[in-house]
Amino acid sequence: MRRDLDRLLNEGVNLHRRRFVTGLSLGGAALGLQPFGLLAGRGNEPGGTTLQGRVFNLTISQTAVNFTGSARVATTVNGSLPAPVLRWREGDQVTLNITNLLPETSSIHWHGIILPSAMDGVPGISTGFNGIRPGETFSYRFDVKQSGTYWYHSHSGFQEQTGLYGAIIVDPKEPEPYAYDRDYVVLLSDWTDEDPNDVYAKLKKLSHYYNNNERTHGDLMRDLEQKGLSTTWNERKMWGQMRMSQRDLSDVTGFTYTYLMNGKNPADGWIGLFKPKEKIRLRFINASAMTFFDLRIPGLKMTVIAADGQNVEPVTVDEIRLGVAETYDVLVEPADNAAYTIFAQDIARSGYARGTLTPHLSMTAHIPSLDKVANLEHRDMGMSMHHHMDHGMPDAGHSQPNMPATMDHSQHNMPGAMDHSQYTMTDRIKQMAPNSSDFSTGPVNHAATEYGPHVDMLSEDPQYRLDDPGVGLRNNGRRVLTYADLRSLHTTRGHPDPDREIELHLTGNMGRYMWSINGVKHADAEPLRWKLGERLRINFVNDTMMNHPMHLHGMWSDLESGDNYFLPRKHTVIVQPGSRISYRVSVDAEGGWAYHCHLLYHMLGMFRTVIVS
């Protein structure tokens, strides 16, 4: 990377190969010697430009940038970070000609877009697609069958971490259900000056390398004063036995990350203009590699109108947690001639991205302080609240216990897969209220492949916690959006009941930085084989203390939220630590599909290939 940077800075920037924002002069900024935020446009053009139409020509290349005072090399589209906003129209066929000027293979995945497998952009998994080799052009062509807010990013190596991501807006062919005066993309991301390969290597050697919020002697003294010696001792003993940290909230933090909003660092900040009493649509996109953001606009209520591009019944909140790869659309209506800060702090409270909604460029708003760092609780370990703190977790290396007869894996052809393919759900659903969801609160079973040194935690009592805002947001005095608030704007009454269900456990060993599904990493796992036309119920159990944003390519995930008549539709679902969650999938897309945790440094292990035939 250093050699690439020297080449770019010494040779200058070839604008034929690395196109900067239209109209930028060949000065210091063009050489990457100024903060790259200067290259980004204002308003709804976070990457400096919005491209609209049916045919798009995009070039992937290396571009010199500077977010921190040190020049680095980014992976960009048309010389822009974020990449240009792509604006499509529902019902159109779009063609995207992607030219790769990198010295390595690249790709682009259209996140949340329903399209043929061959156009999905995952090398080695998407049907017939092996990536875009250096110097080559690949043409994506597909019909746009949906509307809403989405995004695109590389699915090759760590290119997403180095800048290859951008927003997609799909305008509906029918009139929108909501009126607004302004329309802004607010794209959040995380940037590191380090080579992502070095970041990953450090995590493999010391998983908490970037955690600067470990508990201190001062925390111990406060606990002794507030909880007493016995409770404090038992609590500390429990965490010590598990060799886990109560503040293990995020693998990579502000210790190395600079958090960006529309390509602007916190010092510069993004700016969106408005006139008082205008209604503004904000399209929030979490395009980060590893960061969960907790977002609020002090002084303004946000009315959520869409989740992952799909319209939902309006719900008014103060704060939203954006998991990696999620999108939320909100409406805000500033009544006063005043400025407001868009404040997005990371889940570990190590930094923030920010922007300003303002009537005038000269007006600024107060920037809030970071919230206090939260501690993980019993519920985040999948433990019952009455669990005695003197009970240590099982030794990760203990022998496999006798499995109940119902968990006989001898007939399974997938390592560790709990595919109840012969289990019909008709009787269960008939016993439920006509429009209610079964939240799978029964006993949890662990596959034989979960036992061993590669898995350091098993949830004993994972709960379905749709109404839990999550660690750091509980009881904070603000109205926080939860999945329980999401209700589809359109009925799902006619959707069929599931034919069968599959249980997937999210597993890992934090100390060794090993991630897997059902205790099996992707390289050792057989594909999940689904039948075209069937309706599945996916049950996730999180056997780790991390949030995992699970993304299924090519098909919608209908979240079981309590009302089967209005199931919210998502492309990325957050599985909270020590919890369980379920959704329904109509298997309507033939071919090969990726299914994975969207935390970039988890993806090598917590990943499955899905084959639909």
Regions found by a protein language model. Give the residues of each.
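N-terminal export leaders
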Residues: H16-L33
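Mobile cap/lid helix-loop segments that border enzyme active or cofactor-binding sites
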Residues: A71, L188-F274
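Signal peptide processing junction and immediate N-terminal pro/mature segment
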Residues: F36-N44
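Extracytoplasmic/periplasmic copper-protein system
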Residues: G47, Y165-S189, R354-H386, G605-S613
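N-terminal secretory signal peptides
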Residues: M1-H16
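Predominantly extracellular/luminal regions of secreted and cell-surface proteins
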Residues: T59-S61, L224-Q241, Y483-T507
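Histidine- and aromatic-enriched segments that form or immediately flank copper-ligand environments
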Residues: R3-L5, L51-A179, D251, T256, ...
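Histidine- and aromatic-rich segments of cupredoxin/plastocyanin-like copper-binding domains
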Residues: D120-I125, N130-I132, N234-D395, H409, ...
